[in-house]
Amino acid sequence: SAPKSPPEGFRSLFDGKILKGWKPAARLPVPQYPGAPFKWRLEGEALEAAKKNTGRWLVENGAIVGGQEPPGSGKGAYLVSEEKFGDFELIMDMKPDWKTDSGFLVRTLPGGSPGMQILVDHRPQGGIGGFYGNGIAGVHGMPFAIDAEYDKKGNPIGMIAANPDGDRVELSKKTRSILKYAADVDDFLKVWKFGEWNTIKVRCEGRIPKLTTWVNGLKIAVLDMKAIEWENYDAEACAKLQGRKGHISLEVHNNNFNHWLGKDRWWPGAVVRWKNIYIRELD
């Protein structure tokens, strides 16, 4: 895990006691890409209620704990840094329950999204350390996909590589090929500690950012936003939308119960935990 105090050149963004410097926000839909047609699916009281649901964010045992509010409701949320950052390295410890779809977004707008998400999809057909563009054309860079192995009682006991030939597969040649670097799933499985704390690091640099991730010291993925082709992705338009600096937001995903993942995207009562959150600004 990350050290208890900031490494040289880094400073802490969370004191382990209160959520000072962070603001909860509702997880609301955003246009798929800058200028995309957009219509609220909710209206009236339902829309107002959605805007007010900012999730369940607590501090327990020195960690930020994020979950749905109420648990099992399928309603997601963000926890957004009050500060904005341009070029930086961010390191933190994470402990997601099995069957959570989490991660954190960088260079986001004040509502927690749009932004580029570093994935902590700790669920079937998920992945850790890849990327997804929330409102950034859905750009999806994923080096590998994971699943869990279970004991005879159905309890998850460890992580395995997901079946690449199943009906419902998110990993594809496309999601892997847009990465400048993609770790091998076997190397990842050697370093990941299932059910324990793991350390994730991201480096974000450049006006049109280049993103690099590490998990427990293993380099996972590199995505150069200048050098990719993706449907509806316009590097200049997205850089303009995000700005040279943006917020960091921790994510609790919502469930779409009509989607094939259903409850498996965020299991009722599941939480994700974050601690030892340190940043080093490079600009």
Where are these regions (language model features)?
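Carbohydrate-interacting regions of secretory-pathway proteins
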Residues: 1-283
